[in-house]
Each structure stands twice: as structure tokens, then as C-alpha cells.
Amino acid sequence: MKHAEMTGQIIGIIPARYGSTRFPGKPLASILGKTLLQRTYENSLRASALSDLIVATDDERIFEHVRSFNGKVVMTSEQCPTGTDRLAEVLSLYPEWMHATAIVNIQGDEPCLNPLTINLAVQALVNDPQGQVSTIVTPLLDEEEAKNSSIVKCVMDQQGNALYFSRALIPSNKTNSFKNGAIYFRHLGLYVYRPSFIINYQKLPSTPLQLEEDLEQLKVLEHGYRIKVAIVDQANIGVDTPEDIHKVEEWLCKQNTFL
């Protein structure tokens, strides 16, 4: 882990909860001899943009596990309603990080996340001195995925700022049909924030579109902040259910890059 050609500290934080409706104990699930969380942590360390990396958890089992592989970890409250709230608590425990250039929120169930994707998301915010948030999207070419309400879509302006996020098919047309050749983008759950924005975000009231779509990022847009968007070639294989473990193992074996 080293500094890329960027100014100031870039801190990566991996929020990790033991409880999960679809997959209890997910962070400690085994993937080819290492846990999901360890693979995510070690893979994230390969991102040259990061100056530091820490796991934020409310569970003693996860805390001890991260320490067992010499990772950096901090205990946070069980009362944090969202991952963003957990980031804010970490900043209260490490006040010196309030002076960092950016904080990267890395999902704990992304063991296949390309470290270059982290770098790209960070660079998008660093290149926008007035920006507060950046994120990642990837082209969406499959009609079934494009119409899947579990997959969040994004449309952007010509400057690479998010215009809207939706569970519906966007952009749409008069017949609400998938159009081959149209540009659809899938939103990936990686965010980069200015430290001060994380604190301010907690104070912002919920907004109508955020509540209707059940998408936190819409609160950012509805309150007038912009989200800078970077584009990557393809999505990563995340782990939502126990069945996804096999997909990740197959991918790792094919890549043979960080077994």
C-alpha cells in the first residue's frame, strides 16, 4: 500500500457486520482457506491510492479475526443504522483523519474488487476540488439485469456527475423497453467521501426520492450535492448469499492472482 500521485491521506474503511438476513456470519465465511473479510481486506491493500486501511465492526468475533491476520480494526457501536454512520464513528475515534483528502467506503463482501477500481474512484474525487462524493458505475448490457430492481442504475451528465439513481430502467423510453445500443450503467457500491461531508451527511434529513427508491445516495443529490462518477469495464462478483461463495471461488481459481 502506497500513495498514488495524489495529495494527502486516503483512508480506506471496511464496515463489517456479523448479522445478515440472507447470510448470517458472512464476513467470516471461508473462501479457499481464507475468510471473505480477509480476502477483501488483503485485496484492498493492493490499491496504491490508500494510505491506510481499517475494518470497522460491532462484533467481537470479527474484531478478533481481523487482529489474527494482523489487520487494522476498530470496534464501533451496534447502534449505527448505516455504513455511513459507521464511517462517522470511525472519524470520531481517529480525529486526525478529518484532515485526510478522502475516505473510501469499501464493501466488506467484495473480495474480487479490482484495486484499480478503488484508485479510479479516489482519483475522480481528487480531480474535483469542490466535489464531496465520488462513486463507480459499469456498463449494463443484459436486459434482465437492467430491469432487475435489485440492480441500481445511474444516469450522468456530460461532465460525469450523477443525475439520478434508480431501481427502474433508466434511461427509459415511451414503451419502457430495453434498447440494444442504448447506454445503461449499473451502480457499484463503492463510495469516496470528503471527511467533512460524512459528518454533514448525518445531519441531513431524509428525502422523498431517497425513501421511495430506498437509495441513500439520492439524499445526497436531493440536498444539492453532486456525485462524481467514474466508469469501469465490468462489475465485480460480490457475495450476497451462500451460493455466491462458489462463484467467487471459481473466479479466483481462473484469475490465479491472489490465492
UniProtKB/Swiss-Prot annotation:
GO molecular function: 3-deoxy-manno-octulosonate cytidylyltransferase activity
Transmembrane segments: none
Enzyme class: transferase
InterPro entries: Cytidylyl_trans (IPR003329), KdsB (IPR004528), Nucleotide-diphossugar_trans (IPR029044)
Cellular localisation: Cytoplasm
Assigned EC number: 2.7.7.38
UniProt keyword Nucleus present: no
GO CC term, one of those recorded: cytosol
Keyword Cytoplasm set for record: yes
Protein family: Belongs to the KdsB family.
UniProt-listed PANTHER family: 3-DEOXY-MANNO-OCTULOSONATE CYTIDYLYLTRANSFERASE (PTHR42866), 3-DEOXY-MANNO-OCTULOSONATE CYTIDYLYLTRANSFERASE, MITOCHONDRIAL (PTHR42866:SF2)
Function: Activates KDO (a required 8-carbon sugar) for incorporation into bacterial lipopolysaccharide in Gram-negative bacteria.
Entry protein name: 3-deoxy-manno-octulosonate cytidylyltransferase
